[in-house]
Amino acid sequence: MTAPETRTAPFGRMLCAMITPFTSSGALDPDAAGRHAAALVADGCDGLVLNGTTGESPTTTDAEKAALLRAVRAAVGDRVPIVAGVGGPDTRHTIDLARQAERAGADGLLVVAPYYSRPPQAAVETYFRRVADATGLPLMLYDIPDRTGIRVEPETLLRLAGHPRVVAVKDCAYDLLGSTKVIGATSLAYYSGCDELNLPLYAVGAAGCVSTVANVAPRQLRALLDAFDAGNTAEAARINRLLTPLTELMTASGLPGTVTAKALLGAGPVREPLQPAGRGATDGLRRAYEELLTTTGRCPSPAPVP
């Protein structure tokens, strides 16, 4: 077990991959975003990740991304770090987004691997280095091959770890062996980006998690990490088991995490081509959530977002 004091966690342990609230007409709702962010911080989140996969970033404009960041910064102040998602198939646009995020008040950048064109690893490395050199912000590299079509290979991460502003990885690669090797060989802070792997990755030395489930169950996730850090691994495993039914429905049911999180929160529509969860899926999510509250203690849920 990795002692808490030996973990490198530049953005905190438990980060929420925050949804992006929209109004009933589909417009960005910065006020609702601010309320949700403040509730997440009150319920134990150490940091917030905006404009990521759960935040429907492919459907928001550059201006909306900046407005969301400013609204959340105004709501939470300097209490927690805010990491802004950037990235795409165009290095120039990614750099523009990174500089915009820095101006809007981000504390770090979540930089997704360049998707669609599927460049070779040498080009992937160059892409990340160019973004890292473009601002003064620390980078969390986002390895999510199911969405991008390419891995950020462990060997590439080992080389990038030498860059002074490459400090962390959001790991959605489902490669526990590869992740463990990089954790052991570098000072990169690993964050689980797949809720079902939060505890396994934490057990092998990860810094924490960037969680979709944290939108609705932040206190339970905080309790899991606290139990593990206190040496009570049995309690951490128990909480993890209790979270599993909800985690499965939210992240592995075939519905995107943002759809399921918004269904539970009543957080407004998703943007097309995504579609809202149906009645049956929503009812199942609510049953799993109520069961979680019953078995873990009725923690206050995040403030509903109109």
What are these regions (language model features)?
Residues 202-306:
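Structured C-terminal cap/extension of enzyme domains
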Residues 143, 165, 271, 275:
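Glycine-rich phosphate-binding "P-loop"
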Residues 2-149, 159, 299:
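Active-site beta->alpha loop and helix N-cap motifs at the rims of alpha/beta catalytic domains
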Residues 9, 13, 17-20, 114, ...:
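Flexible, active-site-adjacent loop/turn segments at secondary-structure boundaries
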Residues 33, 65, 69, 94, ...:
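A general structural signal for well-ordered alpha-helical segments in protein cores
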Residues 133-134, 145-247, 251:
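Catalytic alpha/beta core domains of metabolic enzymes, predominantly
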